[in-house]
């Protein structure tokens, strides 16, 4: 027995066999490496914290999917105006968009209840209780019903930003009481929050984010509320106004969301859908903790570098807003059954959570660490 016994014999390919092999190879299916483009048009400018969060969302989705989903984040007004984002996503003009559910109030007033819960004492929900209700207390199911069945939009929604309570806003006028405030032309958010200011007797103007600073420079508005110090800085309010009024009760919850076209989303694999969902949840938490950290720093920057005077909102303004908030919730609930369902669901959940979380908030509200 020789060594050749254990060695494989060389294979000789004839021209015919080689041609056949090539034909089989050329006809075999080729695995595509093309990625799915996912454009997210935001309702905020580049440079804002929300835009930063969206870019991180895109980077993580791209990395986790090995490039199968190519997320491209576009700033406010890049393709459509901010108030048209939902409609553009619905019809597939863009794959996704970012704004706050209150921006969809033209379709149904209840959208604001999932984004900018009005006047904390009226609903009983602060930011964390709102998320507890949304994820654990049936809030998400109500929102899906609202968007997909009541409004009839072909979208899937993912909360991605949270910034908690919002200041009253910016002005060049010292405000000592509600009467002073009522004399100003005040830019409000759209939807329910704007209605509350109207109910209170404030002269309101709604402007999209693209219009805010130019309108202030032209004197179209005397005072403007946006989001918080970090986001307001990105808008440039510190270059237009001298006074920044904090401590308002009109809005204690702020949730920004990505809405994704349902056809686009349904065509993704279950694994890639899970990546989008879990990535949204991860940046949602980061946005909240980053928001607290940076807003504290930004207030100092406003005062030391820009000469902004940080003011406390007069108490009678907050009392008037509380009364107006209660009234608008009652009026809207009487007008619309779905709106009433959401308000009841939120209040019921807030009541059930109060034995635990309300006690904690009460302690925080009455005690401070010694200097």
Residue ranges and their predicted role:
Residues 10-12, 31, 47:
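Intrinsically disordered, low-complexity segments enriched in proline/serine/threonine
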Residues 33-130, 150-371:
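N-terminal secretory/targeting leader peptides
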Residues 138-152:
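Hinge/lid segment of periplasmic solute-binding proteins
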Residues 14-27:
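Bacterial N-terminal signal peptides
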Residues 1-9:
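N-terminal secretory signal peptides that target proteins for export/translocation
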Residues 26-34:
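Signal peptide processing junction and immediate N-terminal pro/mature segment
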